[in-house]
Regions:
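Alpha-helical scaffolding within the catalytic cores
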Residues: 1-2, 40, 96-109, 141-143
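N-terminal active-site segment of His-dependent metallophosphoesterases
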Residues: 1-72, 152
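Active-site-proximal beta-strand elements of phosphoester/diester hydrolases
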Residues: 10-23, 115-125, 156-160
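Active-site neighborhood of phospho(di)ester-bond hydrolases with catalytic His/Asp-centered motifs
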Residues: 15-17, 53-60, 84-90, 122, ...
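Metal-dependent catalytic neighborhoods of phosphoester/phosphodiester hydrolases
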Residues: 25, 57-78, 93-106, 131, ...
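Short glycine-enriched, charge-decorated loop/helix-capping segments at active-site entrances
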Residues: 27-33, 127, 169-175
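His/acidic metal-ligating clusters that form di-metal
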Residues: 41-54, 131-190
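Active-site neighborhood of divalent metal-dependent phosphoester bond hydrolases
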Residues: 80-107, 114-119, 123, 127, ...
Length: 190
Protein backbone atom coordinates (compact mmCIF):
# COMPACT_ATOMS: atom_id res chain seq x y z
CA UNK A 1 0.00 0.00 0.00
CA UNK A 2 1.41 3.36 -1.06
CA UNK A 3 0.39 6.18 1.26
CA UNK A 4 0.43 9.81 0.13
CA UNK A 5 0.53 12.57 2.71
CA UNK A 6 -2.25 15.05 2.05
CA UNK A 7 -3.74 17.72 4.32
CA UNK A 8 -7.25 16.40 3.68
CA UNK A 9 -10.11 17.97 1.81
CA UNK A 10 -10.17 17.84 -1.96
CA UNK A 11 -7.71 15.52 -3.71
CA UNK A 12 -7.01 16.71 -7.25
CA UNK A 13 -6.27 13.69 -9.42
CA UNK A 14 -5.28 13.95 -13.06
CA UNK A 15 -5.91 10.93 -15.28
CA UNK A 16 -4.00 10.48 -18.51
CA UNK A 17 -4.60 7.49 -20.75
CA UNK A 18 -3.75 6.18 -24.20
CA UNK A 19 -0.74 8.41 -24.72
CA UNK A 20 0.65 5.79 -27.16
CA UNK A 21 4.20 7.17 -27.08
CA UNK A 22 6.29 5.52 -29.79
CA UNK A 23 9.82 4.14 -29.46
CA UNK A 24 11.28 7.44 -30.68
CA UNK A 25 10.07 11.00 -30.14
CA UNK A 26 8.11 12.22 -33.13
CA UNK A 27 6.59 8.82 -33.81
CA UNK A 28 3.02 8.85 -35.06
CA UNK A 29 -0.17 6.90 -34.50
CA UNK A 30 -2.85 7.38 -37.15
CA UNK A 31 -0.83 10.34 -38.45
CA UNK A 32 -0.60 12.08 -35.06
CA UNK A 33 2.70 12.80 -33.31
CA UNK A 34 1.91 11.26 -29.93
CA UNK A 35 4.64 13.15 -28.06
CA UNK A 36 3.30 16.43 -29.43
CA UNK A 37 -0.24 15.45 -28.45
CA UNK A 38 0.78 14.59 -24.88
CA UNK A 39 2.78 17.82 -24.58
CA UNK A 40 -0.32 19.78 -25.68
CA UNK A 41 -2.44 18.03 -23.03
CA UNK A 42 0.16 18.73 -20.33
CA UNK A 43 0.36 22.40 -21.30
CA UNK A 44 -3.44 22.67 -21.22
CA UNK A 45 -3.59 21.09 -17.75
CA UNK A 46 -0.82 23.35 -16.46
CA UNK A 47 -2.73 26.40 -17.74
CA UNK A 48 -6.22 25.44 -16.61
CA UNK A 49 -5.72 23.17 -13.56
CA UNK A 50 -2.16 23.66 -12.36
CA UNK A 51 -2.63 22.15 -8.88
CA UNK A 52 -2.45 18.36 -9.15
CA UNK A 53 -2.12 16.10 -6.09
CA UNK A 54 -1.59 12.82 -7.93
CA UNK A 55 -1.48 11.55 -11.47
CA UNK A 56 -3.04 8.33 -12.76
CA UNK A 57 -1.68 7.01 -16.07
CA UNK A 58 -4.16 4.32 -17.05
CA UNK A 59 -2.68 2.31 -19.87
CA UNK A 60 -1.53 2.30 -23.47
CA UNK A 61 1.18 4.65 -22.28
CA UNK A 62 3.44 3.41 -25.07
CA UNK A 63 2.45 2.17 -28.48
CA UNK A 64 4.78 -0.81 -28.52
CA UNK A 65 6.25 -1.20 -25.06
CA UNK A 66 9.64 0.41 -25.70
CA UNK A 67 11.62 1.49 -22.64
CA UNK A 68 12.47 4.75 -24.42
CA UNK A 69 8.75 5.61 -24.55
CA UNK A 70 8.39 5.06 -20.79
CA UNK A 71 11.53 7.09 -20.13
CA UNK A 72 10.08 10.03 -22.06
CA UNK A 73 6.76 9.60 -20.26
CA UNK A 74 8.58 9.77 -16.92
CA UNK A 75 10.16 13.04 -18.02
CA UNK A 76 6.86 14.53 -19.12
CA UNK A 77 5.06 13.53 -15.93
CA UNK A 78 7.90 14.90 -13.79
CA UNK A 79 6.64 18.36 -14.78
CA UNK A 80 3.90 17.84 -12.21
CA UNK A 81 4.96 18.13 -8.59
CA UNK A 82 3.15 14.98 -7.49
CA UNK A 83 3.34 11.21 -7.47
CA UNK A 84 2.29 9.36 -10.59
CA UNK A 85 0.89 5.85 -10.74
CA UNK A 86 0.76 3.71 -13.85
CA UNK A 87 -1.08 0.62 -15.01
CA UNK A 88 -0.62 -1.23 -18.30
CA UNK A 89 -2.91 -1.34 -21.30
CA UNK A 90 -2.88 -3.73 -24.22
CA UNK A 91 -0.10 -1.81 -26.03
CA UNK A 92 2.21 -1.79 -23.00
CA UNK A 93 4.98 -4.16 -21.92
CA UNK A 94 4.95 -4.66 -18.16
CA UNK A 95 8.63 -5.72 -18.03
CA UNK A 96 9.71 -2.49 -19.76
CA UNK A 97 7.49 -0.43 -17.44
CA UNK A 98 9.04 -2.18 -14.43
CA UNK A 99 12.57 -1.63 -15.73
CA UNK A 100 12.04 2.10 -16.23
CA UNK A 101 10.19 2.68 -12.96
CA UNK A 102 12.40 0.45 -10.78
CA UNK A 103 12.94 1.98 -7.36
CA UNK A 104 9.79 4.09 -7.56
CA UNK A 105 6.21 3.49 -6.49
CA UNK A 106 4.76 4.12 -9.98
CA UNK A 107 3.34 0.62 -10.33
CA UNK A 108 1.71 0.47 -6.89
CA UNK A 109 -1.62 -1.34 -7.03
CA UNK A 110 -3.13 0.35 -3.98
CA UNK A 111 -2.76 4.01 -3.05
CA UNK A 112 -4.19 5.64 0.06
CA UNK A 113 -4.75 9.39 0.24
CA UNK A 114 -7.10 11.55 2.34
CA UNK A 115 -9.76 8.96 3.10
CA UNK A 116 -9.52 7.37 -0.33
CA UNK A 117 -8.19 4.08 -1.59
CA UNK A 118 -7.21 4.07 -5.27
CA UNK A 119 -6.96 0.64 -6.85
CA UNK A 120 -4.96 0.16 -10.04
CA UNK A 121 -6.24 -3.03 -11.68
CA UNK A 122 -4.38 -4.79 -14.48
CA UNK A 123 -6.83 -5.76 -17.24
CA UNK A 124 -4.07 -6.53 -19.74
CA UNK A 125 -4.04 -9.93 -21.42
CA UNK A 126 -0.57 -10.26 -23.02
CA UNK A 127 -0.84 -10.60 -26.78
CA UNK A 128 -4.53 -9.68 -26.83
CA UNK A 129 -6.30 -6.41 -27.61
CA UNK A 130 -9.23 -6.98 -25.27
CA UNK A 131 -9.10 -7.02 -21.51
CA UNK A 132 -9.78 -9.41 -18.67
CA UNK A 133 -9.34 -9.12 -14.92
CA UNK A 134 -9.18 -12.78 -13.98
CA UNK A 135 -9.25 -14.43 -10.57
CA UNK A 136 -6.10 -12.77 -9.22
CA UNK A 137 -7.20 -9.20 -9.95
CA UNK A 138 -10.76 -9.83 -8.79
CA UNK A 139 -9.40 -11.42 -5.61
CA UNK A 140 -7.15 -8.42 -5.01
CA UNK A 141 -10.11 -6.09 -5.62
CA UNK A 142 -12.31 -7.98 -3.17
CA UNK A 143 -9.66 -7.95 -0.43
CA UNK A 144 -9.00 -4.25 -0.94
CA UNK A 145 -12.70 -3.37 -0.85
CA UNK A 146 -13.21 -5.39 2.34
CA UNK A 147 -10.31 -3.50 3.95
CA UNK A 148 -11.62 -0.14 2.72
CA UNK A 149 -15.07 -0.84 4.11
CA UNK A 150 -13.67 -1.78 7.53
CA UNK A 151 -11.49 1.35 7.56
CA UNK A 152 -14.22 3.70 6.31
CA UNK A 153 -12.41 4.57 3.07
CA UNK A 154 -13.92 5.55 -0.26
CA UNK A 155 -12.59 3.59 -3.24
CA UNK A 156 -11.72 4.59 -6.79
CA UNK A 157 -11.16 1.64 -9.11
CA UNK A 158 -8.98 2.23 -12.18
CA UNK A 159 -8.38 -0.08 -15.13
CA UNK A 160 -7.45 0.36 -18.77
CA UNK A 161 -10.16 -1.62 -20.54
CA UNK A 162 -13.74 -0.45 -20.19
CA UNK A 163 -16.23 -2.76 -18.49
CA UNK A 164 -19.32 -1.39 -20.31
CA UNK A 165 -20.06 -0.87 -23.97
CA UNK A 166 -19.50 2.69 -25.11
CA UNK A 167 -21.33 2.58 -28.44
CA UNK A 168 -18.25 2.36 -30.66
CA UNK A 169 -18.09 -0.98 -32.49
CA UNK A 170 -14.29 -1.38 -32.69
CA UNK A 171 -13.80 -0.21 -29.11
CA UNK A 172 -16.61 -2.35 -27.72
CA UNK A 173 -14.76 -5.41 -29.06
CA UNK A 174 -12.08 -4.67 -26.42
CA UNK A 175 -14.43 -4.72 -23.43
CA UNK A 176 -13.39 -6.52 -20.23
CA UNK A 177 -14.57 -10.08 -20.83
CA UNK A 178 -15.32 -10.76 -17.16
CA UNK A 179 -17.17 -7.50 -16.57
CA UNK A 180 -20.15 -9.36 -15.08
CA UNK A 181 -17.96 -10.76 -12.28
CA UNK A 182 -16.40 -7.30 -11.82
CA UNK A 183 -19.79 -5.60 -11.39
CA UNK A 184 -21.15 -8.40 -9.19
CA UNK A 185 -18.20 -7.81 -6.87
CA UNK A 186 -18.62 -4.02 -6.88
CA UNK A 187 -22.33 -4.34 -6.05
CA UNK A 188 -21.39 -5.99 -2.76
CA UNK A 189 -19.65 -2.76 -1.69
CA UNK A 190 -22.04 0.15 -2.30
Amino acid sequence: IQRIDHPGGVVRALQLTDTHLCRNAGGTLLGMDTDHSLRAVIELVKRERPAVDLLLATGDLSDGGAETAYQRLQGYLAEFDCDSFWLPGNHDERAAMEAVTAGSDCLSREIRVAGWQLLMLDSQVPGEVGGRLGEDELGFLESALVAAKSEGLHSLVCLHHHPVEVGCEWLDEQIVTDADAFFALLERFP
